[in-house]
Amino acid sequence: MLLISNITIEAGRLGGDVCSIVFLQNKGGSMGAKDTKAKEYLSDNERFADLCNAVLFDGEQVIKAENLQEKDSTEVLSVLGTDEKEIQFQKWRDILKQAVVKSYGNMYFMLVGIEHQTEVHYAMPVRVMIYDALNYGAQIKEAARKHRKEKGACTDAEFLSGFHKEDRLTPVVTITVYLGADQWDGPRSLHDMLQKTDDRIDALIPDYKIHLVIPQEIDYFDRFRTTLGEVLEVIKTSDDRRAMKKLLTENPKFSEMDNESVAAINTLIGVNIPLNKEGSVTNMCKAWEDQKEEGRRELIRSMLSSGKTPEEISAFANLSLEEVQALYMENTEQSN
């Protein structure tokens, strides 16, 4: 492995069917940059609706992008403590939207939140449960406020609870999207987080399972209608460079990837695939091959700079001596 500037180049022999060059940036990247890019990318209504339909409705086009409405992602609930002082609970979701679902001639509303994780969160079920509970609590408080304002008739029980018998809550669903390259080894439900007890005790505790999207486990990429599916598929192969090369060079969908998706891939998995600056789409297959060739040339320049002879490089890189000598002359001219 060679380190050239901030670029890592992994190589075996450089010719034939043997390991080809992989041209990477700092793989760790900035967690803040990844979080910002993930939020920006998934906030798009088309991709948001696509994710919901693929994950929640088996690909059926239930949620339409045009029927999504951005909601305040701050979950706030104020309650009175034992000393009659108000206590405020506040959490910040990544994304929250109201969706309209049409079914059998009826129209329903639901709230869908998306939490994106670039690292495993070992308390995710409780975190999601708190988000959802705060939202339901806020809905109840809003219903009580509305009833007080209207001053309509109510029973003693309805007055005490603030929530009337006919009142109903808007369903809240949270999708957790894991964008890390490592396997998710965290809990997937509340029961996964509980200490081991008697099965009879477990049966008494309601479970809370999260809707978890893990690219490495997805086998339903055909459900996606936007390039979000391709982005998740690249993330799935991000730790297997041969698989990624095969995906990018053999799947025709990657010949016309929108630049936003390519930029998301670059940030989320730490690669540096050049964007097409002359248009809105990038041929990732060509960009991959161009980048591989540039990495090949960069490695040869580095070997020349370190004192390797053209003959040694020719044998290592499986290149003709003429090709290496041409790069040698180019390198010499640049040095001068």
PLM regions: where:
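Elongated, amphipathic alpha-helical interaction scaffolds
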Residues: M1-N336
